[in-house]
Amino acid sequence: MDMVTVTAKTVEEAVTKALIELQTTSDKLTYEIVEKGSAGFLGIGSKPAIIRAKRKETLQDKAIEFLEQVFDAMNMAVDISVEYNETEKEMNVNLKGDDMGILIGKRGQTLDSLQYLVSLVVNKSSSDYIRVKLDTENYRERRKETLETLAKNIAYKVKRTKRSVSLEPMNPYERRIIHAALQNDKYVVTRSDGEEPFRHVIISLKRENRRDRNDRSDRNEK
C-alpha cells in the first residue's frame, strides 16, 4: 500500500492534503504524526506539521495482494479485477491472462481451491462472512450450462430406464446446480449422498411415478 508523507501548517491540514493526494475518505485513511508542528511566537520559530498517511487496506486489497503472491510464485502474469458488493457481502474476483487452463484445472478443481484460499484470506479480516466467487474466462457460467445439460440428459435416461443414476462427485456449488436444474421436473427427484470429497448427486424416479410405470408395465404384460 502506497504511503505518502505530507507537510502542512497543522496536522488537520496535513490530513486534508493526504485525503486529496490519496483520493480517499477520512474513514479509509490511516496516518501517523511525525511532527505535530508549532506556530512559534509571532511566526518566529514555527514548525510545520508532518504526517505519514496511507489508505486503509480493504478486503479487495487483501484478495489482490494474496493472489499476486500466488501468481508471482507460479511465474504467471495475471490481471486481477475485484468487485465487492458491501450490501450483499459478495466479492467477485475475475482473472485474465494467458493459459488460464492451468488455473482452472480438471473440472475446475484448481480454481475452486484458489477460491477457497481467497475466501479464507478475506474472511479472516471481516466481521461478516463474505461470499467469494473466483472466475476466469467465464468458466463458472460455462460449467453451469454443462451441468444443467447433463442433469436433463440423465433425467431423461432415468425416466426411460426407470433406474436411478449416480453422478460423479461434485463440490457443493455444482451439486446445487444439478438440484436446481431438476427441481421442477414432475418425474424425477434428486438427492445428495456420501461424504466429502466423494459426495455426489443421485437422480431417481419419484415414487408415485415409479409405481405408476410399474403398474402400466404389469398391465402390458397381461
UniProtKB/Swiss-Prot annotation:
Spans annotated as Jag_N domain: 2-51
Q: Which residues form a coiled coil?
A: none
In the record, biological process GO terms are:
cell wall organization; peptidoglycan biosynthetic process; regulation of cell shape
Asked whether the UniProt record includes Cell membrane among its keywords, one would answer no
Q: Name one GO cellular component term.
A: cytoplasm
R3H domain residues are 138-204
Which residues belong to any copy of the KH domain? Answer: 54-133
Concerning PROSITE patterns, the annotation shows: R3H
Q: Has UniProt tagged this entry with the keyword Glycosyltransferase? A: no
Task: Give the Gene Ontology MF terms in alphabetical order.
Answer: RNA binding
> For this UniProt entry, what is the primary localization, expressed as one broad class?
cytoplasm
Which NCBIfam families does the record associate with it?
Jag_EloR
Comment block on domains:
Has an N-terminal Jag-N domain and 2 RNA-binding domains (KH and R3H).
Known function: A probable RNA chaperone. Forms a complex with KhpA which binds to cellular RNA and controls its expression. Plays a role in peptidoglycan (PG) homeostasis and cell length regulation.
List the protein's name.
RNA-binding protein KhpB
